[in-house]
């Protein structure tokens, strides 16, 4: 079997395609959450604690010297990424919780009783006929 054919079979399996769709949607969701944190949540939060822009929080490890740029540790961006992570983790937690609840609800619903087979119907008719033929007391 050629390697291309093997790869095609691997790539077209349901789990791989589902995973690819999940990664793409997850990346798009990550961008939305990043925008939510940086554009919606952090500005009012910064305003509440004195007009602080978290993106600007940094620690200069070494000043710029000539054409060599400064070495800066941007911990404000790290704080924002922590907020991103917490929101994404919470959203995923809620989605999984909802999926589990729906799955449990489906499992809890009793299955419809199976319809009687032709043999069972015939046996029931024979039973009913025998009951009718018995003398009543």
Swiss-Prot record:
Membrane-related topology note: Multi-pass membrane protein
Cellular localization per UniProt: Cell inner membrane
Chief location bin: membrane
UniProt keyword NADP present: no
Gene Ontology MF term list: mechanosensitive monoatomic ion channel activity
Transmembrane segments: 10-30, 76-96
A GO cellular-component term linked to this record: plasma membrane
Keyword Nucleotide-binding attributed: no
Coiled coil residues, start to end: none
Origin: domain of life: Bacteria
Signal peptide (from-to): none
Assigned keywords, A-Z: Cell inner membrane, Cell membrane, Ion channel, Ion transport, Membrane, Transmembrane, Transmembrane helix, Transport
NCBIfam families per record: mscL, PRK00567.1-1, PRK00567.1-4
Role summary: Channel that opens in response to stretch forces in the membrane lipid bilayer. May participate in the regulation of osmotic pressure changes within the cell.
Subunit structure: Homopentamer.
Record family assignment: Belongs to the MscL family.
Name of the protein this chain belongs to: Large-conductance mechanosensitive channel
Gene name linked to the record: mscL
């Amino acid at each position: 079997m050629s390697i291309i054919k093997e790869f095609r079979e691997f790539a077209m399996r349901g789990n791989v395609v589902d995973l690819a769709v999940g990664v793409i949607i997850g990346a798009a969701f990550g961008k939305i959450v990043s925008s939510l944190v940086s554009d919606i949540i952090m500005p009012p939060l910064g305003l509440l604690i004195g007009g602080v822009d978290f993106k600007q929080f940094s620690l200069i490890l070494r000043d710029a010297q000539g054409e060599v740029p400064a070495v800066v540790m941007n911990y404000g961006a790290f704080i924002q990424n922590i907020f991103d992570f917490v929101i994404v983790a919470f959203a995923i937690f809620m989605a999984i919780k909802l999926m589990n609840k729906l799955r449990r609800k489906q499992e809890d619903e009793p299955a419809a009783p199976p319809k009687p087979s032709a043999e069972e119907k015939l046996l029931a008719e024979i039973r009913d006929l025998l009951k009718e033929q018995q003398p009543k007391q």
